Amino acid sequence: MSLRLGQIVDALGGSLEGGERDTEILRIAPLESSGPGDLSFLSNPRYQSQLAASQAACVIVAPAMRNAALERGACIVVEQPYTYFAHVTQLWVRAHGQGAPAGIHPSAVVDPQARVAPTASIGPLCVVERGAVIGAHTVLKSRVTVGERCTVGERCILHPGVVIGADGFGFAQQRGEWIKIEQLGAVRIGNDVEIGANTCIDRGALDDTVIEDGVKLDNLIQIAHNVHIGRHTAMAGCSAVAGSTRIGAHCTIAGAASIVGHLQLADNVHISTNTVVTHSITQPGQYTGVFPMDDNAKWEKNAATLRQLYRLRERIKALEQTRKDG
């Protein structure tokens, strides 16, 4: 498998400098381990030291790195090297026929009342239930389940073991017993969504659970019933969102972060790893917080004190200054 530098530049743009269009690229590789015949990229100037030592046939660089790249050989100069690299990987897959073939695998179970676009790919052991809709060019890899009446848009990728539309966790308590609340909603997934392996998105209790266009979900994520995730939000592995929470557009949720139910997060909110979000966030920005488990009454007192810590610090500093002045 190979591509020539001229083919890459013709397809994606960029300025090829210090090299020949017919140079053959055999592999896309990291800068530090690349060799002859490889195409690599430098997106962070901190790793410029690796550039001089790289054996890559060609390196994708920003204009600021052009001269340094030319000292070692060929380069493709673009404004956003990392984004260009992403497009190169897609071009590579298309050129070498590595994408999933359209059609339904013989071992998949698709209800006659489901609608699957002719260009969609339904992998081995998938289940698509009654009334479900799978959009054009969407790929369901092995063992994906799309539940009754759930909708998956166009150009989506669902990795192995994804479950769309299992019942949400809804129960009413009666005399010490749990009475199941039937989950009557569905799940609606927009276009260009990617969902990692073994992630679960539960159907809504009454209204639908909604995942908007361009959302990216990592492996092992739990999305509870009636959650609404805004467009182009990304969530890393082992994070979780409890029921009826609304997350805005262009947010990022780092690994193992948890968001409790019935909250609202504004657009462009960024949650750090292991953070537990317990109240709504109305302003864009980065939010971080980790607090140890304790008896609940003690935890509430300590948490309340912690929130006043900076104010207490300033009061102490003022008192100390008063003593010095006195």
UniProtKB/Swiss-Prot annotation:
Homotrimer. This is UDP-3-O-acylglucosamine N-acyltransferase. InterPro entries: Hexapep, Hexapep_transf_CS, LpxD, Trimer_LpxA-like_sf, UDP_GlcNAc_AcTrfase_non-rep. HAMAP family: LpxD. SUPFAM superfamilies: Trimeric LpxA-like enzymes. It comes from Acidovorax ebreus (strain TPSY). One of its GO terms (biological process) is lipid A biosynthetic process. Keywords: Acyltransferase, Lipid A biosynthesis, Lipid biosynthesis, Lipid metabolism, Repeat, Transferase. Its EC number is 2.3.1.191. The gene is lpxD. Belongs to the transferase hexapeptide repeat family. LpxD subfamily. GO terms for cellular component: membrane. It catalyses: a UDP-3-O-[(3R)-3-hydroxyacyl]-alpha-D-glucosamine + a (3R)-hydroxyacyl-[ACP] = a UDP-2-N,3-O-bis[(3R)-3-hydroxyacyl]-alpha-D-glucosamine + holo-[ACP] + H(+). Pathway: Bacterial outer membrane biogenesis; LPS lipid A biosynthesis. NCBIfam families: lipid_A_lpxD (TIGR01853), PRK00892.1 (NF002060).
